[in-house]
């Protein structure tokens, strides 16, 4: 099953999200970046720019933090020294009236051009990272105030016409219609948006910046007006990108900070805050569309208890009011708070590790003495799994694999991977009375920590249907094989197709 990385918007508070991800990255203790563990990366506003910088720019989190600080200093210049606050606010107000933006929108565009180049398209050969990771960047259409998503993929049910029916679909019966939002894909290839244009559009928050006009589209503005936390929107897209995958194996949602007013302060709020206009503004700002944390709570309320275990939220709680989106002076404080605040790093670490492993049947189930015997193999998303196995072994020396009802077995031993190329393949056997009964395989780190592998728990029937989608039963051996010279299972990987990436698309 696919995994999702979602990054909230929040202006300068984006530094908090970067630092929180960096803390998880350090806990993973692997040489590749955090985002490579995920199949679908989505972002809104500054979260969208960060997603582009990581997945398209292929920068590390350390590099992205440094680049972020440079962008902020260029886009949000400090007020003149000695200028009274009231006068600075008055200047900003008149700038907004005169040019429809407080800050220079041309400067923002130039910063994005310098960051992402002037020629790279989001949907192009060079824009598609070899890993095959899908990207979704949120925006809001100005005229209708509806959600739009920039993508580097098509999906089966690409978009809807004004009549509400899909304009391009390959399977009319099985495509899940997109309702209330569309993918921003132009009718002709020449009008494909450039990466810097997508970055410029997703952060065009009123009144700070003007909307962005793109060829072949209506003007668009900040995606945070409709989905400041794009986690749920990513779930909407799952069935269009990966038909047959109704739920993700893991969702890591990264916030940029929030503030909950304590009850005792609510009881003593001024009479002015209880009047009509402040109530309207407060309700608007706290709505799930704009408030990332409230959006997350609403999403969890729609999930059952078992599904919630796959949803992880990283966020920072402020004791006082949230810093303004353009308050660059708060960045040092934001960074320090994000480095010291509590987040469940162990939950993120162990869940991400487990999501990197998935199961494939090596043959159809066989009925024997009232039980279906199912032979299969545990594989890894990464071609070379040695560094990942080393990190798991270092943190949890006694880790094992919990296989269905059979109990615990060894996991990641020297006989389960190639010592020359690192290809991981651990064969296991599952037993079940019915093909429709969910079975489970999990990484058992210690007596208190156990995480499901990708696609578990699930029925054997689900695996059979997935591997038979093309009409014939396909196994991992039909996609790749290891051809290293045999020296106690030391083998080299030989891909049967040159299009297969180093990070596998099988999950």
Give the residues covered by each predicted segment:
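Conserved catalytic cores and adjacent C-terminal regulatory segments
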Residues: 1-507
């Amino acid at each position: 099953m696919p995994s999702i990385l979602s990054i909230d918007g929040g202006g300068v508070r984006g530094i908090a999200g970067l630092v929180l991800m960096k803390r998880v990255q350090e806990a993973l203790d692997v040489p590749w970046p955090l985002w490579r563990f995920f199949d679908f990366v989505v972002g809104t506003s500054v979260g969208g720019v960060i997603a582009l910088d990581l997945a398209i720019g292929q920068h590390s989190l350390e590099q992205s933090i440094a680049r972020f600080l440079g962008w902020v200093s260029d886009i949000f210049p400090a007020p003149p020294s000695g200028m009274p606050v009231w006068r600075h606010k008055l200047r900003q107000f008149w700038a907004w009236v005169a040019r429809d933006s407080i800050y220079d929108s041309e400067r923002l565009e130039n910063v994005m051009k310098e960051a992402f180049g002037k020629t790279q398209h989001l949907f192009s050969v060079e824009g598609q990272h070899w890993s095959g990771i899908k990207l979704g960047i949120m925006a809001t259409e100005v005229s209708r105030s509806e959600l739009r998503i920039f993508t580097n993929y098509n999906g089966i049910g690409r978009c809807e016409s004004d009549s509400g029916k899909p304009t391009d679909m390959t399977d009319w019966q099985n495509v899940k219609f997109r309702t209330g939002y569309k993918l921003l894909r132009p009718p002709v290839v020449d009008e494909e948006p450039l990466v810097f244009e997508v970055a410029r559009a997703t952060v065009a928050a009123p009144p700070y910046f003007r909307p962005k006009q793109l060829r072949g589209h209506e003007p668009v503005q900040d995606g945070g007006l409709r989905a400041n936390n794009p986690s749920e929107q990513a779930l909407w897209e799952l069935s269009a990108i990966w038909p047959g995958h109704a739920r993700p194996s893991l969702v890591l949602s990264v916030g940029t900070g929030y503030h909950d007013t304590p009850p005792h302060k609510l009881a003593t709020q001024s009479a002015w805050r209880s009047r009509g206009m402040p109530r309207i503004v407060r309700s608007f700002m706290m709505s799930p569309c704009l408030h990332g944390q409230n959006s997350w709570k609403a999403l969890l309320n729609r999930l059952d208890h078992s599904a919630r275990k796959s949803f992880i939220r990283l966020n920072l709680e402020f004791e006082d009011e949230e810093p303004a989106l353009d308050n660059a002076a708060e960045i040092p404080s934001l960074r320090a708070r994000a480095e010291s605040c509590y987040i469940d790093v162990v939950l993120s670490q162990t869940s991400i590790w487990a999501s990197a492993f998935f199961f494939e049947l090596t043959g159809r189930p066989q009925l024997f003495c009232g039980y279906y015997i199912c032979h299969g193999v545990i594989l890894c998303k990464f071609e070379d799994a040695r560094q990942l196995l080393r990190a798991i072994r270092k943190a949890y020396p006694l880790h094992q694999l919990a296989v269905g009802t059979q109990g615990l077995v060894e996991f990641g031993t020297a006989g389960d991977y190639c010592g020359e190329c690192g290809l991981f393949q651990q064969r296991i056997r599952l037993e079940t009375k019915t093909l429709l009964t969910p079975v489970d395989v999990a990484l058992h780190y210690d007596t208190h920590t156990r995480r499901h592998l990708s696609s578990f728990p699930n029925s054997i029937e689900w695996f059979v249907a997935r591997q038979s989608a093309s009409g014939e039963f396909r196994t991992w051996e039909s996609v790749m094989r290891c051809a290293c010279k045999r020296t106690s299972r030391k083998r080299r990987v030989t891909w049967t197709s040159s299009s297969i990436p180093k990070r596998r698309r099988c999950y």
